[in-house]
Amino acid sequence: MIAFIDTSAFFALLDREDSNNRKAKNILEKILIPQNTLITSNYVVIESFSLIQHRLGLQAVREFHEDMLPLINIEWINKSTHQSGVSALLTASRKKLSLVDCVSFEIMRNLGI
């Protein structure tokens, strides 16, 4: 199985006060097996660094970088994927949809997730 991990999942795993912390940890324990591939994008990593640093501090960023990221395959966004994400964002014209979301959907579509 291939699973895409987004910023909200990373944050829930790190923030003990997050209402989804326990649920996120349980899901990670179930899917963190050699047969599965966990994927995120470099855009999600940047977004996660920013959110974690702002809300939880640099120690949490360090934990994320040193403990979590080594478990995840990072898809590096190329120009074509970026442009597809921008097009999707502008076409959708929805305030709560971000470029990171649109690029994530494009990656998942390309990988058949």
Residue ranges of model-derived segments:
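Active-site neighborhoods of divalent-metal-dependent phosphate/nucleic-acid chemistry enzymes
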Residues: 74-113
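Short glycine/serine- and small hydrophobic-enriched flexible loop segments
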Residues: 50-53, 109
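Short, well-structured N-terminal submotif of metal-dependent ribonuclease cores
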Residues: 1-39, 53-63
